[in-house]
A protein has these predicted regions:
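Alpha-solenoid HEAT/ARM repeat scaffold
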Residues: 22-23, 54, 84-91
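Buried hydrophobic core positions in alpha-solenoid tandem helical repeats
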Residues: 40-42, 73-76
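Short inter-helical turns and helix N-cap capping residues of alpha-solenoid HEAT/ARM repeat scaffolds
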Residues: 48-49, 81-83
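N-terminal alpha-helical scaffold/docking segments in eukaryotic complex subunits
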Residues: 1-63
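Hydrophobic face of amphipathic alpha-helices that form TPR/SEL1-like repeat modules
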Residues: 59, 91-93
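Flexible loop/turn segments at the boundaries of HEAT repeats in alpha-solenoid HEAT proteins
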Residues: 29-37, 63-73, 96-103
Length: 103
């Protein structure tokens, strides 16, 4: 089992692509409770590295299928991020929300 810092260090080394971000989100979601994942995502979103914010967005997208606070954070905070990669991850997050909520 990788620690959060190991997952984050791996993610920060890769500049392109989404697979490693989604893999990191999956690892975190398997290790921690949904409540812990939500708090972690909020902290990760404050990080200056766009990769960390992408990871936060991926986690929040998975949580937002059933968590209205995560959905609101995506709509109100993530949507204002200026990095296009974070916006791409936001689009994927909303795809997941729509798939699970039936919208």
């Amino acid at each position: 089992m990788k620690s959060i810092s190991n997952i984050l260090n791996h993610i920060l080394q890769i500049e392109n692509g989404f697979k490693h971000i989604n893999d990191g989100a999956s690892e975190i979601m398997e290790i921690y409770s949904k409540e812990q994942c939500f708090e972690l995502a909020l902290e990760l979103f404050k990080h200056e590295a766009y990769q960390a914010r992408m990871l936060a967005t991926s986690i929040l997208g998975r949580l937002a299928a059933t968590n209205n606070d995560a959905l609101c954070f995506l709509k109100e905070q993530v949507s204002t991020d200026k990095n296009w990669r974070v916006q791409e991850m936001l689009a994927k997050a909303f795809d997941e929300v729509c798939e699970h909520r039936g919208v």
